[in-house]
């Protein structure tokens, strides 16, 4: 359940710091959040599959690490990103 090219481009355009920015923590966290939300919707009716759940846990942990990094580097960018994405932290 990966994101389409158009969805990725829209997310990158919305969260990038400068033109062509695809590697900033904000962009990476936004892409991971979209992937996590899409995978959660897929996993609701199918409760017996363990491999996608494992992938979901890996994505959540990776997003948490990126958010911890951003929180240590710049707390204002961190709090702005949390507010824009609607994450609980």
From Swiss-Prot:
Example of a GO biological process term: translation
InterPro entries: Ribosomal_uS15, Ribosomal_uS15_bac-type, uS15_NS1_RNA-bd_sf
Domain of life: Bacteria
Gene3D superfamilies noted in UniProt: 6.10.250.3130, S15/NS1, RNA-binding (1.10.287.10)
Pfam families cross-referenced by the UniProt entry: Ribosomal_S15 (PF00312)
Database matches in SMART domains: Ribosomal_S15
GO cellular component: cytosolic small ribosomal subunit
Keywords: Ribonucleoprotein, Ribosomal protein, RNA-binding, rRNA-binding
Molecular-function annotations in GO: rRNA binding; structural constituent of ribosome
Quaternary data: Part of the 30S ribosomal subunit. Forms a bridge to the 50S subunit in the 70S ribosome, contacting the 23S rRNA.
NCBIfam families registered for this protein in UniProt: S15_bact
Function field: One of the primary rRNA binding proteins, it binds directly to 16S rRNA where it helps nucleate assembly of the platform of the 30S subunit by binding and bridging several RNA helices of the 16S rRNA. Forms an intersubunit bridge (bridge B4) with the 23S rRNA of the 50S subunit in the ribosome.
Family from the record: Belongs to the universal ribosomal protein uS15 family.
Designated name of the protein: Small ribosomal subunit protein uS15
